[in-house]
């Protein structure tokens, strides 16, 4: 048995706050898309203006039930999301750290197929997703560590239709608290271990008495910087590593319009490789990572690819 709303699966939306962005599914509540961060997930650059472009590629044909079993849904879903994030790390200090703010504007394409025969659902759409606004975040830097926290809101301005699974809007507000850190085991900072967690709460779904349960999710990464002289043409400062994420629904869905089992909580884990490098003359960082999901319950299980490009000004 799965949540009824998962028949209208994979409403993809992309957000981003503090090292982020999101793709989500039907009544799976999270706005944030896992997989947008990896190596040095909780490390923020110094004061300045930055443009961060996230490209997400999610592919799945596997819907998992409440016990992790594959549900015969004849599912085939592909999502491409492009999230545009503008970041200002100010010179203003709060609690000894740098105050920063950012906004994330996602656009999402979803190609959705599920079911059989007369019950088969086909839908595809490209549209604006819900917008992430983070007015308050703080980052700190020590000799062998970085840390960051942040508060963000997700505004339901994206196209929303509960009867169309390819629509990117989710139809409700969300609030996200983010906190994490990066530790450098060696003085030269060639090794890094990072963790970035988020707690997400949701408002009522538009025109329905439904409030989805809170979510907790985190991204992590273990990275190794290669020798500086190791480069390919203009590409320098290579780092390689292993990354991953996990997501858990914390409490029950609620409301008189909930028609599925409120006690069912979705979850998923993922792990995969990452490589990143810098193009110094362009002041640009490029990150490529792939996360392979496993042990999913009450949601899809697939592959999340990500290409992120950050430009400093």
PLM feature spans:
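Residues that define the transmembrane beta-barrel architecture of outer-membrane proteins
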Residues: 47, 76-84, 122-132, 169-175, ...
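Outer membrane beta-barrel transmembrane domains
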Residues: 70, 207-313
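Long, hydrophobic/aromatic-enriched structural stretches that serve as scaffold segments
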Residues: 77-141
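Sequence/structural signature of outer-membrane beta-barrel proteins
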Residues: 60-62, 108-114, 124, 154-165, ...
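Transmembrane beta-barrel strands of outer-membrane/channel proteins
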Residues: 51-59, 101-107, 149-155, 195-199, ...
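Residues on the lipid-exposed face of transmembrane beta-strands in outer-membrane beta-barrel proteins
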Residues: 41, 53, 84-90, 133-138, ...
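Surface-exposed strand-loop-strand hairpins of Gram-negative outer-membrane beta-barrel proteins
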Residues: 27-30, 58-81, 116-124, 165
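Short loop/turn motifs that connect adjacent beta-strands in outer-membrane beta-barrel proteins
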Residues: 26-28, 40-48, 91-100, 140-147, ...
């Amino acid at each position: 048995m799965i949540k009824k709303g998962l028949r209208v699966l994979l409403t993809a939306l992309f957000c981003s706050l503090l090292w982020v962005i999101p793709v989500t599914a039907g009544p799976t509540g999270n706005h944030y898309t896992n997989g947008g961060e990896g190596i040095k997930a909780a490390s923020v650059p110094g004061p300045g203006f930055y443009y961060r472009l996230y490209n997400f590629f999610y592919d799945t044909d596997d819907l998992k039930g409440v016990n992790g079993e594959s549900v015969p849904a004849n599912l085939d879903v592909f999502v491409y999301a492009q999230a545009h994030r503008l970041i200002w790390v100010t010179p203003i200090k709060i609690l000894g750290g740098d105050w920063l703010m950012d906004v994330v504007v996602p656009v999402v394409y979803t190609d959705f197929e599920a079911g059989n025969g007369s019950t088969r659902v086909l839908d595809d759409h490209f549209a604006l997703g819900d917008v992430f606004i983070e007015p308050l975040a703080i980052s700190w830097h020590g000799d062998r560590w970085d840390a960051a926290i942040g508060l963000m809101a997700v505004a339901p301005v994206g196209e929303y239709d509960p009867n169309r699974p390819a629509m990117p809007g989710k139809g409700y507000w969300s609030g996200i608290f983010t906190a994490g850190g990066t530790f450098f085991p060696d003085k030269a900072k060639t090794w890094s271990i990072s963790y970035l967690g988020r707690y997400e709460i949701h408002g009522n779904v538009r025109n329905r008495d439904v409030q989805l349960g809170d979510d907790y999710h985190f991204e992590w990464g273990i990275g190794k910087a290669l020798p500086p002289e190791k480069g390919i043409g203009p590409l320098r400062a290579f780092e390689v590593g292993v990354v991953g994420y996990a997501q858990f629904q914390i409490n029950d869905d609620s409301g008189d319009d909930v028609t599925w089992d409120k006690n069912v909580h979705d979850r998923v884990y993922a792990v995969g490789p990452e490589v990143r490098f810098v193009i110094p003359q362009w002041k640009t960082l490029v990150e490529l990572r792939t996360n392979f999901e496993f042990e999913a319950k009450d949601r899809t299980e697939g592959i999340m690819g990500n290409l992120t490009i950050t430009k400093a000004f």
